[in-house]
Amino acid sequence: MPVVWPTLLDLSRDECKRILRKLELEAYAGVISALRAQGDLTKEKKDLLGELSKVLSISTERHRAEVRRAVNDERLTTIAHNSAFFFV
């Protein structure tokens, strides 16, 4: 039998599905945070989120919750406010 690298872990199919879902949710949350920190939501960013939500199987409810989280995050709001001056 050939050696596989990296080594495959002893994870069940259910564990793999659970881990994958967690990665998808974290990735979407990270993109939402980054886009919020960049400032205004442009049409291109909205389109990107639409595509990502499809690819990562993000429900409308989850999308709305992530947007609420990001909009109410003081750190992200501060970064967005201050980054407006980076490009002046």
Give names to the regions the model predicted.
Residues 65-88:
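Eukaryotic compositionally biased, intrinsically disordered low-complexity regulatory regions enriched
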Residues 9-56, 60-72:
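Eukaryotic low-complexity, mixed-charge intrinsically disordered interaction/regulatory segments enriched
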Residues 1-14, 88:
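Long, charge-rich, low-complexity intrinsically disordered regions
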